[in-house]
C-alpha cells in the first residue's frame, strides 16, 4: 500500500478546539440589590415636638440603589432601576437609644402605679420625624459622576481588597450613568445624642405579586453622627454637588446652600 494511503481510507478525526467557558451566571434578582449611602449624615440640631420646629439632618442622607453586574446598555437593567414600587425606609439603629426608650417605659410604668392617668404617659414622642419611607428618584445621568460608586460585580478580583461597590468608578465621569436615589430631605431628630441610622430597601410589588409579606432586599448603615442641643450646634454646611444636581433635576424638596452661606453657620 502506498505510503499515506491508509490515512485516506481511515482518516483520523480532526482535533476539536476546546469549547469556550460558559458566561458567568447572573445572580438571582433579589441578590442583585445593594444599598449605598451616597451622602452620609454628619450632624443635626435637636428639634422640638412641633412640625414647625423641624431641623433637618445635615447633610440630608441620600441613599442609592446598586445592582450586581449592572449594564447601562441593558434596557432590562434600566427598567429595574426605574421600578416605582421600590421604597427605602429608615429606623434608629443606635442600641443606646433603644435602651433609653426601655428605661423611659419603665419610668412610665412606675408613674402609673398611683392609678392616675397622665397625658404624657399615654403617648410617646418618636425621636425621629419626617417621611419614614421614600420613593425612588431616577435620573438618566448621575449629577456627580466623579463621586459615583461602581456597581458591584459577581466576578471577584483578588487585586481588589474592598468590595466592588466601595470602589469609585472614575469611568462614570465619561459616561451618562443612570442612577436611582432615595433622598431623606426632611429627616429630623428630637433628642441630642449619638445616632446611627439603618436604611432598608423594599419593593411594594412583592406583596402584590406573591401575596406574602414584604422582604428586606438590602440594607445599609450610616456612619455615627451627633445631634446637638441648639446652643452647641456648629451650623449648616454648604450643599454638595450631588444635592445641588438632584435639585436641578427636579427633586425640589432639597434645600440647597452654597458659597459659604449655610443657614445657621457660625461666623469665625
Swiss-Prot record:
Residue segments, region Disordered: 1-124, 142-165
Keywords: Nucleus, Sporulation, Transcription, Transcription regulation
Domain Velvet: 28-257
Localization in the cell: Nucleus
Annotated Pro residues bias: 14-26
PROSITE patterns: VELVET
Disruption phenotype: Leads to a marked reduction in penicillin biosynthesis.
Domain of life: Eukaryota
Any Pfam family: Velvet
The keyword Secreted belongs to this UniProt entry's keyword annotation: no
GO BP, one annotated term: sporulation resulting in formation of a cellular spore
Compositionally biased intervals (Basic and acidic residues): 1-13, 92-121
Cellular component GO terms, alphabetical: nucleus
PANTHER family named among the record's database cross-references: SEXUAL DEVELOPMENT REGULATOR VELC, SPORE DEVELOPMENT REGULATOR VOSA
Its job: Velvet-domain-containing protein that acts as a positive regulator of sexual development.
Oligomeric and partner information: Interacts with velA and vosA.
Family, as annotated: Belongs to the velvet family. VelC subfamily.
Descriptive protein name: Sexual development regulator velC
Species per Swiss-Prot/TrEMBL record: Penicillium rubens (strain ATCC 28089 / DSM 1075 / NRRL 1951 / Wisconsin 54-1255)
